[in-house]
Amino acid sequence: MLFEDRQKNRSTGPTLIGFNQTQNEHENTVCPTHPESSDRILKIKEALTKTKILEKCTVLTNFLEIDDADLEVTHDKSMVKDLMESEKKTQEDINSQCEKYDSVFMTENSMKVAKDGVACVRDLTNRIMANEASNGFAVVRPPGHHADSVSPCGFCLFNNVAQAAEEAFFSGAERILIVDLDVHHGHGTQRIFYDDKRVLYFSIHRHEHGLFWPHLPESDFDHIGSGKGLGYNANLALNETGCTDSDYLSIIFHVLLPLATQFDPHFVIISAGFDALLGDPLGGMCLTPDGYSHILYHLKSLAQGRMLVVLEGGYNHQISAVAVQRCVRVLLGYAPFSIELNEAPKESTVDSCVSLVSVLRHHWNCFDYFPSRTSLRLAQWPIVNTKVIYNYDPTTRRADTGEIIQDELASTEFTASDVIPTENMETLIYFNEGDDAHFDLEEDNHPEKPARTRRILKTLRESGVLEKCVDRNCERIATNEEIRLVHTKKMLEHLRTTETMKDEELMEEAEKEFNSIYLTRDTLKVARKAVGAVLQSVDEIFEKDAGQRNALVIVRPPGHHASASKSSGFCIFNNVAVAAKYAQRRHKAKRVLILDWDVHHGNGTQEIFYEDSNVMYMSIHRHDKGNFYPIGEPKDYSDVGEGAGEGMSVNVPFSGVQMGDNEYQMAFQRVIMPIAYQFNPDLVLISAGFDAAVDDPLGEYKVTPETFALMTYQLSSLAGGRIITVLEGGYNLTSISNSAQAVCEVLQNRSMLRRLREEKEQFATKPQKIESSCIKTIREVCAVQQKYWSILKGFQVTPSNYGLDIDDEAYDDDSIDMADQSSSSGSSSSSTRPSHNLEIMDSGPAHAVVPLATCPHLKEVKPLPPAKINARTACSECQIGAEVWTCLTCYKYNCGRFVNEHAMMHHLSSSHPMALSMADLSVWCYPCDSYVHNPALIGAKSAAHESKFGETMPS
C-alpha cells in the first residue's frame, strides 16, 4: 500500500516496546559504576512490569539483522570499519582505541549490542510506518545522538535516530521531525541532517554559552542548517540550570509546536534523553517525569500519531525509569497526570526562545507573531540579548564522568495510581431522543432545530464511531435543586408557566419576554433533560480514575447564552455552567475549566462565573469590535473578570476577516493552553459550538473538523483526561456532524489520526497565512493576561513595554508579509529607518541607539572591490532598489528586512557578518545584533557616500 493510502486509512494499533536483548554485554570495563550501564534498562523493565504497562504493549526482542551497508547510510564506511575491528581485539586494545574518541567505551561485544539497537529502531519504524502499530518506544543502548557520520562520541556508537529516520524515508515518509530532549546537544544527529530539508531537527539542551558538554559553538541558536537545509535545524540552547516544567512547556507552546505544525511531518522521532530530570547527576535541570509525558503528549498530535521514542541519556536510573513509564502511558493513549506550573519561565529561557525565533522567523511564517528582531521600531523585547556568546576554553581539560553510585541518588516510588487499570478506557455518548419536542412553532427552518442532533448521531452511527463508544439515551431530568445551582428561582418558576400555555401564548411570550428564544409546552422538560444528560456525564466521569472516561454530550437546546436569571440566544438553561457547579458540589472538583469555542461569545457562562476564582471561562469567538452577537456584552480581551474572579475570564475576540484553522491553532498555542496549564483544572468542560466551522451560515468562519479535533486533543492533556464536550451552536448540518465526528474520534482514540491539512496545502507549496488582525488580537490578550498568568511573561511584545508611541497599524503590518508591502513602497522604506532612529535617539538615553565601537567580526570586512560601491544599485536577488545593503565581505547587494529580507538571507547562508546600508550608510553586524562604527569601516562608508552624493564624505 502506498504511503498516501496509509495516511488516508490511519487507525489505532498497538504500542510497540523494543528491547535489544544483548544490551548487558556492553559495559564500561574501566569504571563498573559508570552511569551508562545495563542497569538503566533493567530499571525501566521493572517499572513497566510493576505498573502493568508492559501487559498493554506489544513487546519485541527479535529483529531482522542489519549489515554494514545499513549502517553506512548514516555513517562513513571508514567509521564502520574501525568500530567493527573492535570485535577482534583484546579489551586492552579496545580501551586504547576508545581513547581516540570523546567519552566512548566498548567491549568485544559492543558492536553486536549497538547493531541490535539499530535493528530495533529500524524494525519499529517500519511497523509504525506500515500502520501495523500506532507508535513505539525503543528501549535500547548504547544511545546514539552524539555519534555523527565519522565518529562515535559521548557514550554513543551508532546514531539510532538517524537510522530510524532513514528507515522512515524508505517507508515513504517525506518529512521527519526529530525532537531531542536530552540535556546534552545531539550534535551527531544535527551534523548528519544539517543540509537536509527533509528533516527538521529540534533540540532543547543545556548549553550555558558553551560551558556545558559538548562545548560546541554549533550547539547555539544561530546554527539553523545550511544549503537546502537552511532553516531546518533549531537549537533551543538553555543557558541556565534549574529549568522546570514551566520552562519546557513554554518552549513547546511558543516555539516547537508552531514550528512543527507548519513543517507537518509524516513521522516523529523523539531522542528521549532523561538527563534533564530533577535528580539526574549530570543534567542540572528540574524537569519532572510528568513534564516529559506532557511534552510527548503534544508531539503525538503530529504525523497522525506516528511516533517512535528512542532512549538516549538519563543517569538517575530509577527516576529515568519513572519517566519512561509516564511516557509509555501517553503512547498507550492515557492522558498525562496533571502538573503544577507555579512559576514563570526563566528570563534566560525566554531569551533563548526569542533568540531562536529571531533566526528562524525568516524561514517560517508561524513566527509572524514575533516582530522583526533587528527592526528598531519593533525591537521591544524587554529582556532579550541575541548576541552569540561562547565562553568555553577548549584548552580546559574536560572532566571525566567518573563513577556514580545509584543508591546515593534521589529516588521516587510508584503509587497505586501508577498501575494501569485492567478495564479499557471508554468514551461516553449522551443524547436525548425526545429533544424534537422543542422546536420553533412559527418557522420550520429555524437554525436551532431538532435535525441538528439527529444528523450528528446519524453521522456517528454511519461512520462506525458510535459503536466504539458507550452510547446512552439519557432520560435523567435535572432537579430544581440542581438547576438552581446556577439559575434563579424566579427564572425557573417563569419557565414552568409555559408548560400550560397555548401555542399562540407561547409565541407571544417568547417574543415579549425573551431574546432569540422560541418555546413549546415541552421546552422546559427538554431543557431539564439536556442539563440532566450533562450532569450524568459528570457523575460517570468521576466514577472512574481520571482519564478512564471522557464524554460527548449531544443535547439541545444549547446553553452558553443563558444567564443566571434569563434564557437567551436559543439557550434555556446553561448546561455547562450547571455542570461546573455540580462537579464542585458533588465531586469536590476544586477548579473547573470551561473552554467555549462557539463562534458567539458565551456571555451567560461568563456572567455566571465572572467573580468566581475557581471556574475559569475561556472563549475564542467572533467579536468584530463588539458588533457581532451578543452585542453590548463584555467580551473583549480586556474583560478579565472582577473581584475574586479577576484573571479568570480569558477572551480571544477576533475581529475583521474570516478566521480559520491557523488562527484558532495560534490562539491555542499562545493563549489557551499555557494559561490552562497554569490554572491546572480538575475537570474540563468544552462548550462545543460548531458555528465557527466551514460553511456555517451564522458564523461565516472556516475552521475545519480537524482543528476542532486538535483543540479537543490538546485540552485532553488537562485534568488527567477528565473532559466533557457539550454541544452548543452550529447550524450547517453537514459541518456540525463532520466536526462532531472528528471530536468524537479524538475522544475515543485518544489520538489525532486525522491529517491537519491536505497534501496539496503543505507549507512547501502554500505557506500558512496568519491573519494580521488575529496576531493583533492575540498580542492584546496576552499583554493583559500576563498580569495574572506568569507563564506568559516575557513572551509578549507591546509598545508599552518600552513606553514607545507606536501606532497599531504600523505595529501589525511590519511583522507580517513584509515582502508583500515592499514591492510597491518605492524608496520610502529606506528613509523611514534613519528618521525613526533619530526619533528614538532623541527620546533620551533609555532608548538611545549607540553603535558598538568595535566587534570581533570586523576582521571579516574585506577590501573594496575594483568597482568600489554603487549606492544606487538594486538587490541582486529581486532587483528592487529600496533599502539595499551591501555585504562587507563579498560586496553582494541585497535588500533589507522591510523589502524581501535578502540581506538577512545572505548572512544566514554565507555567515558573512556585516552589511552596509545604502540608505543611511550605517553598518549592521548580524551576529552582534547591533550597529557598529569603527575606523575599519570608513573606507566602505566613504565609497558609498561618494557614490550616493557625488562628493567626498565629511571627516
Swiss-Prot record:
This is Histone deacetylase 6. Pfam families: Hist_deacetyl (PF00850), zf-UBP (PF02148). GO terms for molecular function: histone deacetylase activity; histone deacetylase activity, hydrolytic mechanism; protein lysine deacetylase activity; zinc ion binding. Its EC number is 3.5.1.98. Zn(2+) 2 binds at residues 875, 878, 895, 902. Keywords: Chromatin regulator, Hydrolase, Metal-binding, Nucleus, Repeat, Repressor, Transcription, Transcription regulation, Zinc, Zinc-finger. The keyword Transcription applies. Residues 425-749 are annotated as: Histone deacetylase 2. InterPro entries: HDAC_PDAC, His_deacetylse, His_deacetylse_dom, His_deacetylse_dom_sf, Ureohydrolase_dom_sf, Znf_RING/FYVE/PHD, Znf_UBP. The keyword Zinc applies. Its main location: nucleus. SMART domains: ZnF_UBP. The gene is hda-6. Zn(2+) 1 binds at residues 855, 857, 925, 928. Transmembrane segments: none annotated.
